[in-house]
Regions:
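Acidic, His- and aromatic-enriched active-site or binding-groove loops in soluble protein domains
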Residues: 136-156, 220
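Short, low-order "capping/linker" segments at domain edges
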Residues: 128-140, 199-215, 308
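An acidic/histidine-cluster motif and surrounding catalytic segment
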Residues: 160
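An exposed, glycine/acidic-rich loop-and-rim segment of catalytic or binding clefts
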Residues: 166, 174-221
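Glycine-biased, low-complexity coil/linker segments
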Residues: 11-13
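C-terminal accessory/tail domains of diverse enzymes
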Residues: 2-6, 18-113, 142, 209-406
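Helical (often loop-to-helix) elements that flank the catalytic cores of nucleotide-handling enzymes
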Residues: 99, 136-143, 164-185, 268-281
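Short, glycine/charge-rich beta-strand/loop segments that flank catalytic centers
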Residues: 114-131, 194-199
């Protein structure tokens, strides 16, 4: 049988993938005000009786066409997934306002189409075999390329962008941020179930997405030219259509002029989303200022940062990880390193006006992450349907708050 390769594999054009994104070699690094923010969230569309996923994205998008936030709502690979994107925000408080409005809006839209929404890294019991691929060229071609790997990608993430005003700085800051991937993952982990089974992992989403090519922690780059050369080689040879088909846990986004943190599971509670976003923004600012002062940002071998990330995916906030900054011989709880980072970034959070939102990170450490909450519900009665119901109620709590405010 003759194998038919899509255009982006043969190098004969982009094949439609990544349309709207120029090559990393074709334009300068985007300019945005430093430390401005953007957040993307992926939500489940749920049947309110069975709490299984429903394939309602087209009807929800159609209902949103004339709405005030319709440009902020998008389809994803599966028809049971809805994505929202905030506008550019200056502060974590702006993110809170924007996502509160968006969660309220999509919850209302979903109800109008007979479904509900939920935010977590995986749906606890839905099966990827029962999902339909969204009828868009980008997604069809993605499945053509990745086959089973793409078809089983029934996972949900939360991505955060922070603007950096210089590409060289962005690369060095990204290198420094690798050591913080376990902290970000442990705070956001919300996928302890997969296909109806408790996995023993705080984030089973990480293991599903690890099958994707060009995923996981990125390598360390010497400078922006090093990054552009590597990505340009992939583009020139047709391995990828553009740089957005590099799915690292953290990556530069040249068109937007941002660093994008992608390691996080979708987060259920809005307050936790905002806290983690404030944490990320403050860390970026800390490393930017370290770079501007002429000091070297510390980095570590990819094997070590990848091992720490695995431990965070396995154990969540209880993960015993290597303290790479001090080199101590014994592993320490990731929560201890989160607290140390909080102390380091608090002055930066004050300057950013996000000190109050940053306190939410300590609240996550005190009461647990999304994975912990799901397991508490599960352990109470072994009812996995109730786990999904709780996810939806907690996700839509932002909608209730927004309605009360109005």
């Amino acid at each position: 049988m003759k194998q038919i390769f899509p255009p982006s594999i043969t190098g004969k054009g982009s094949g439609g993938l990544g349309s709207g994104h120029a090559s990393v070699l074709d334009h300068s690094f985007g300019k945005s005000d430093p430390y401005t923010l953007g957040v993307e969230e992926e939500y489940m569309l749920l049947d309110p009786e069975t709490w299984d996923l429903v394939q309602h994205i087209d009807s929800v998008l159609a209902a949103a066409e004339d709405g005030e936030h319709h440009e902020r709502i998008h389809a994803e690979l599966m028809q049971s997934v809805l994505e929202v994107t905030t506008p550019v925000c200056r502060t974590a408080a702006d993110v809170m306002r924007s996502l509160s409005q968006l969660r309220s809006y999509v919850a209302e839209l979903a109800r109008s189409e007979g479904c509900r929404v939920g935010s977590a890294g995986t749906h606890p019991f839905s099966l990827f075999e029962r999902q339909r691929i969204t009828a868009r060229d980008r997604y069809r071609q993605l499945v053509d390329q990745l086959q089973y790997i793409a078809r089983r990608e029934l996972i949900f993430g939360m991505h955060m962008h922070v603007a950096v005003d210089d590409p060289e700085k962005a690369i060095q800051v990204m290198n420094g941020l690798l050591v913080h991937l376990p902290q970000m993952l442990a705070l956001s982990a919300s996928s302890p179930f997969w296909r109806g089974e408790p996995t023993g992992l705080a984030s089973s989403r990480q293991m599903v997405f690890a099958a994707f090519p060009r995923s996981g922690p990125p390598p360390r780059f010497k400078d922006y030219a090093d990054y552009a050369e590597v990505v340009g080689q992939l583009e020139r040879t047709g391995c990828i259509a553009d740089y957005t088909h590099i799915w690292w846990d953290i990556r530069p986004h040249p068109r937007l002029g941002t660093i994008e943190m992608r390691v996080c599971d979708a987060v259920t509670r809005l307050e936790d989303v905002v806290a983690i976003t404030a944490f990320f923004q403050a860390i970026v600012k800390m490393y930017c200022e370290l770079h501007e002062s002429g000091k070297e940002i510390p980095t570590w071998h990819r094997l070590l940062t990848t091992e720490n990330k695995w431990l965070a995916a396995r154990y969540g906030l209880e993960a015993p990880i290597m303290d790479l900054a001090t080199g101590r011989r014994n592993r320490v709880p990731v929560a201890q390193l989160v607290r140390r980072t909080l102390r380091d970034v608090e002055p930066h959070a004050r300057e950013l006006g996000s000190e109050r939102e940053l306190e939410g990170v300590r609240e996550i450490l005190a009461r647990g992450n999304g994975s912990d909450r799901q397991l508490r519900v599960w352990n109470a009665n072994r009812d996995i349907v109730e786990v999904v119901r709780e996810i939806s109620i907690a996700t839509e709590a932002a909608a209730v708050s927004e309605s009360a405010a109005n």
